[in-house]
Swiss-Prot record:
One of its GO terms (molecular function) is aminoacyl-tRNA deacylase activity. One of its GO terms (cellular component) is cytoplasm. Keywords: Aminoacyl-tRNA synthetase, ATP-binding, Cytoplasm, Ligase, Nucleotide-binding, Protein biosynthesis. The keyword Protein biosynthesis applies. It comes from Thermoplasma volcanium (strain ATCC 51530 / DSM 4299 / JCM 9571 / NBRC 15438 / GSS1). This is Leucine--tRNA ligase. GO terms for biological process: leucyl-tRNA aminoacylation. ATP binds at K614. It comes from the Archaea. It holds the Pfam family tRNA-synt_1. Belongs to the class-I aminoacyl-tRNA synthetase family. It catalyses: tRNA(Leu) + L-leucine + ATP = L-leucyl-tRNA(Leu) + AMP + diphosphate.
């Protein structure tokens, strides 16, 4: 790309990077972000620890940057802030990638070559050899991410760092699972689970490609036997209530089908379905292949005795369900379209609902996939929520909801159907292995369906600060939805299940209460190294009891002071898994006073309008960010490009605008020469305007409106300064009065440059930990009082002046006059008094002569706290320049039949 187009000259980028590196080194050298317990109010913020199977990109960076902005802002408000970080090294993805490198998989090796090349490694082959051990992948990228985070200026306390592979942490996870088991939440039973055939292992969201943003779940189908005189066809459906409306069966003419023995029945399914059935049942065996043509020659009978033909349809996916589909044209849009090509006439209607197929045909475009999908969604919704069965034998009159469950139960009970599980979408693991649903006979899971646990979780959410508020109901719904969750696998990296070490605790279940360990990691590590971190010690630290040694005592104090987490910040895809497990495990294990206090859910990130992926070529790594743009420019982009809850689009065209304003800021600051002499009127207006902006900024930041806050305090202040200077203010005098507080406000976002200018112009302390004065507003009020105004009154002054200028220009535009002089007549004291009386409905005899005029201009009357004539005379030269005419300013009442009212002078142009 053309760097100069978005980032200025190469020399500018070098200067930025030198400043970045200078202050990153200083912060680390002086342990600036390693807080100790003190008398201040504490604030603990956590962001999900990164998974260490590769480099992080611009999308990941948004979440961590937002977390750092909030942490830094809280320091500026004199909170004792802990912002810790660790690394997630559990699960199967790291192991799978390592195995693929060991097996010589070309695509995996190419991927890791690109990672290593980006990090500037010379001995790439040597590193690839090391990556055959999965622990080396995890450790390499943990260290790489630390460097990425440091280069972005994150104010993380790295002394508390640990990983999910650390043995002391695994002791904590074992303690956690014993606690869950004691509460009856750990179960072992037959259970359907997402499964990788190649890896021979259960998988979860963290293991599946795009599993966090494009969820994959287990769906339960009713697989129905359609019988003939020699074998059955098995057709799987989510809607058994439509069986009375079947007209035919669809199969794919080019698909491969297989005859199998399932229980005591002979049946036919697609070749792909055989593997799925084998992983779900132990009574399936293959007899042999069967052609689509031979299937089509037969007729089959529904479970309710209706004989139906078999038709070919290329829309049938043999890798979805059983590869056999029964057709209900009156209640399936795709069936309707395809059936109409084969047959004409009426088809049986078995569900009465508001939306019917004839209306669907009119309302939606059934010639496009988008139209078909939209129509399908609307029809299913109408029938599910409002439909009742008709022409359906004994089930007639039942609602769709009730009929679905009853028909399913009856069919399975009579041996005419079985349960079949399928993934909600096609999925592969991060390593590329196909994901199916398997039923494991001895699966371990956490039972999240317990009523007492759901109640505690709802109690937690209802007392928690959640931003945006709209996600409170979403979180409560997610808690209600959760049932049993598989928590262990046969292979992978991580902690052994304490009561069955053949199993490894899966990666979403070993990372739920880990924020508590940040508070105690230093002491727990020492206890473990000394052989003293057993479950009793962990219990004493987290759950009370008499401590046994100084390390336990210190750990207990750290936990008591820092916990709970005040803000957990994560992205919206984590609601249904990470966040729900986080809430419910805290509810199960900790008392209410240690429950998380707040939750911020950020939006997604796209790049140039598209989902970020290597295949689209729009992945920008965090390392690339700091090399191309500098940390502060990226941080500013994250802050102002989108609201926290909105989708952020990483777009270099937008970046160029931010760089331009950032360079404007740098030019102003680099040329600044402090001047503390007395302020004139325009400079006092600027300072007062800043004071009001600063109050607004704090309110916005306290409400996590980060975008609005920095548009206000960064862009707004730059604009105000330019405006004031154009009106006669000294840039140096104006800045001198606000520079310390402006840099404090900018520090959370443009952290490195704020630190640079703080040291250059303010103090040798660190602005990163130099909070605002609690009484910061008083100094600005003192400056404003020189002119007899408060800062809020000064804030209105220039708005008033600009409105007068706008009124003059409007008159010029409407009349077409080329003005030579403008006479502005401001309401005199009599009119001002009369206006106040008029607005309060108590008009004196003296004021009644103005009553008819005031009544006509009621909406124009604004009684300002300042003297209008004084303000306009002070600004007469400016007004004259703006309207390009001589300006005179007087007071009066009624001029040529018009009254000058407070806030709206009479303007006469010649």
């Amino acid at each position: 790309m053309d760097y100069s187009r978005c980032c200025g000259s190469t020399n500018s980028r070098v200067i930025y990077m030198n400043i970045d590196e200078k202050w990153q080194n200083a912060w680390e050298r002086d342990h600036v972000f390693e807080p100790k317990i003190d008398e201040r109010k504490k604030f603990m913020i956590t962001v999900p620890w990164p998974y260490t199977n590769g480099s992080l990109h611009v999308g990941h960076g948004r979440t961590y940057t937002l977390g750092d902005i909030i942490a830094r802002y809280k320091r500026s408000r004199n909170y004792n802030v802990l912002f810790p970080m660790g690394f997630h090294q559990s699960g199967t993805p790291i192991l799978a990638f390592s195995e693929r490198i060991r097996a010589g998989d070309a695509s995996t090796i190419a991927l890791y070559r690109s990672y290593l090349s980006e990090y500037g490694e010379k001995d790439i082959d040597g590193w690839l050899e090391k990556f055959k051990d999965p622990r080396n992948i995890a450790d390499y990228f943990s260290n790489a991410i630390i460097n990425d985070f440091k280069h972005l200026g994150y104010s993380i306390d790295w002394t508390r760092k640990f990983t999910s592979a650390d043995e002391f942490y695994q002791n904590v996870v074992k303690w956690q699972f014993h606690k869950l088991n004691e509460k009856g939440l750990i179960k072992q039973d037959k259970y359907p689970i997402l499964y990788s055939i190649d890896d021979d292992n259960a998988v979860g969201e963290d293991d599946i490609k795009d599993g966090d943003t494009d969820k994959v779940s287990v769906e339960e189908y009713t697989a129905v036997f359609f019988e003939s005189n020699s074998y059955s066809l098995i057709a799987a459906s989510l809607r058994p209530e439509t069986l009375f409306g079947v007209t035919n069966i669809w199969i794919n003419p080019t698909g491969e089908y297989v005859k199998i023995k399932i229980g005591d029945k002979i049946a036919v399914v697609s070749k792909e379905a055989v593997d799925k059935l084998k992983y779900q049942r132990n009574d399936v065996s293959v007899i042999g292949p069967i052609s689509a043509e031979s299937i089509q020659r037969k007729k089959f009978t529904t479970p309710f005795g209706k004989e139906v033909p078999v038709y070919k349809a290329d829309f049938v996916d043999t890798d979805n369900g059983t590869g056999v589909v029964y057709s209900v044209p009156s209640h399936s849009v795709y069936d309707f379209v395809y059936y109409r090509r084969k047959k004409s006439g009426q088809t049986p209607v078995v569900i009465e609902a508001p939306l019917k197929m004839p209306e669907v045909e009119i309302k939606f475009d059934l010639n496009s996939k988008e139209g078909l999908d939209e129509a399908t969604k609307e029809l299913y919704k109408s029938e599910f929520y409002y439909g009742k069965l008709v022409n359906s034998g004994e089930y007639t009159g039942l609602t769709v909801r009730d009929a679905r469950e009853k028909i399913k139960k009856d069919l399975i009970g009579s041996g005419k159907a079985i349960i079949f599980y399928e993934t909600s979408r096609k999925a592969v693991t991060r390593g590329g292995s196909k994901v199916i649903v398997a039923v494991l006979p001895d699966q371990w899971f956490i039972d999240y369906s317990a009523d007492w646990l759901k109640k505690l979780s709802h109690d937690m959410l209802n007392r928690m600060m959640i931003y945006p508020e709209m996600y409170r109901n979403v979180m409560n719904d997610a808690i209600d939805w959760l049932k049993e969750r598989p928590c262990a696998r046969r292979r992978g990296l991580g902690t052994k299940l304490p009561f069955d070490d053949r199993w490894v605790i899966e990666s979403l279940s070993d990372s739920t209460i880990y924020p508590a360990v940040y508070t105690t990691s230093i002491q727990m590590r020492k206890l473990y190294e000394n052989g003293k971190l057993d479950e009793n010690a962990i219990e004493r630290i987290f759950d009370g009891g008499e401590v046994q040694n100084d390390e336990e005592r210190t750990a207990r104090n750290e936990f008591s002071y820092w916990y709970p987490v005040d803000i957990r910040l994560t992205a919206v895809p984590h609601i249904s898994n990470h966040l729900s497990f986080y809430v419910m495990n805290h509810a199960a294990i900790f008392p209410p006073e240690k429950w998380p206090s707040g939750l911020i859910i950020s939006g997604l990130v796209v790049s140039n309008g598209a989902k970020i992926s290597k295949s689209k070529g729009n992945v920008v790594s965090l390392l690339e960010i700091t090399k191309k743009y500098s940390a502060d420019i990226y941080r500013l982009y994250v802050a102002v490009q989108a609201d926290v809850s909105s989708t952020m689009d990483w777009n270099e065209n937008d970046l160029s605008n931010i760089v331009r304003r950032f360079n404007e800021f740098k030019t102003i600051m680099d040329s600044f020469k402090p001047d503390t002499s007395e302020l004139n009127f325009e400079e006092t207006w600027f300072v007062s305007r800043f004071a009001e902006r600063l109050k607004q900024f704090m309110d916005q930041m306290d409400g996590f409106q980060i975008r609005d806050a920095y548009i206000n305090i960064f862009y707004g202040t730059l604009n105000d300064l330019k405006y004031a200077v154009n009106r006669g203010a000294s840039q140096n005098r104006s800045l001198a009065s606000i520079i310390a507080d402006w840099l404090r406000a900018l520090m959370p976002v443009i952290s490195h440059h704020a630190e640079e200018y703080w040291h250059r112009y303010v103090s040798n302390t660190y602005v990163s930990i130099n909070p605002f004065d609690d009484n910061f507003a008083e100094k600005y009020e003192r400056l404003a009082k020189v002119y007899g105004l408060s800062t809020s009154e000064f804030y209105q002054v220039m708005d008033y002046v600009e409105h007068i200028i706008q009124d003059i220009n409007n008159i010029i535009s409407v009349t077409g006059i080329e003005p030579k002089s403008v006479e502005i007549t401001v309401a005199n004291e009599d009119v001002i008094k009369a206006s106040r009386e008029f607005l309060s409905n108590s008009v004196s005899e003296r004021s009644k002569r103005y009553l008819q005029y005031l009544a006509k201009r009621r909406k124009d009357i604004v009684v300002y706290p300042f003297n209008e004539i004084d303000i306009l005379r002070r600004n007469s030269s400016y007004i004259s320049r703006q309207v390009k005419a001589d300006v005179s300013i007087n007071t009066g009442d009624i001029i040529n039949g018009k009254i000058a009212v407070p806030g709206k002078p009479v303007i006469h142009i010649t």
